[in-house]
């Protein structure tokens, strides 16, 4: 995988995807225009730095995005265009392998699967008699998850230590411009790699709840557990809470 993602061809494909996304608002960033003006050199130098082990990601850019609720914002930490190309090349290379080990009850950030499928799954469970529902979510999931938990799940299926080391390098907490402190945990919301890794952190919980016979669905950090009887949900809540706690996380009450 590492040879493929670090090749000029792999990076060129990733660049095209980053370029399209950057152009959606009709105005390319200055950094994007500069790269496009000397693309061949950019790709060659980036490929060489990855293969020689000299590549280092730049500080993130903080962006505060207003939420629908007045006065509240969502904080994004956005990589540079150069780092986005590397992240996209990684995702393009490993996404299929990662998807193979995910539970069918995990519905977020997956190609060909989405919220409508989650709703259909829950409706089917209801019709099958799973009419008692526990709905919860993980408290501050993205800022508090441990990237190493995702890499532990990912490493055996990727089978390439250099790829795992690169993911660790670009996904580990690092400083954002204008911020004095570096995060000790969590993953940057604004990185295309974040959703994939976030899905994998709770992969064990997904499989455990499903294997225990509960009706189950997860969409990112939102979780629904269904059971035929209300009392069953107490045991389900205890099991889910212990699995989440094993990752240093908590369920919202």
Regions found by a protein language model. Name each.
Residues 50, 63, 104, 120-253:
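Conserved polymerase palm-domain catalytic core
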Residues 1-163, 171-177:
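Conserved two-metal-ion catalytic palm core of "right-hand" nucleic acid polymerases
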């Amino acid at each position: 995988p590492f040879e493929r993602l670090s090749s000029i061809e792999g990076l060129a494909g990733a660049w095209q995807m980053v370029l399209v996304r950057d152009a959606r608002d009709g105005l390319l960033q200055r950094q994007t225009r500069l790269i496009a003006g000397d693309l061949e050199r950019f790709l060659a130098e980036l490929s060489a730095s990855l293969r020689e082990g000299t590549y280092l990601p730049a500080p993130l850019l903080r962006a505060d995005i207003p939420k629908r609720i007045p006065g509240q914002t969502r904080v994004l930490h956005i990589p540079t265009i150069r780092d986005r190309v590397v992240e996209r090349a990684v995702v393009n290379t490993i996404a299929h392998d990662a998807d193979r080990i995910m539970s069918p009850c995990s519905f977020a950030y997956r190609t060909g699967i989405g919220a409508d499928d989650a709703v259909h799954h829950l409706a089917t469970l209801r019709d099958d008699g799973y009419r008692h529902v526990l709905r919860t979510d993980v408290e501050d999931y993205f800022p508090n998850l441990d990237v190493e938990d995702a890499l532990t799940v990912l490493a055996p299926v990727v089978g390439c230590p250099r790829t795992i080391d690169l993911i660790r390098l670009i996904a580990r907490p690092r400083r954002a411009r204008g911020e004095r402190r570096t995060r000790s945990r969590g993953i940057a919301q604004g990185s295309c790699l974040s959703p994939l890794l976030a899905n994998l952190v709770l992969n064990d919980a997904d499989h455990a709840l499903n294997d225990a016979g509960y009706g189950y669905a997860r969409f990112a950090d939102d979780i629904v557990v269904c059971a035929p009887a209300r009392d069953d949900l107490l045991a389900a809540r205890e099991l889910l809470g212990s699995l989440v706690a094993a990752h240093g996380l908590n369920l919202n009450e």
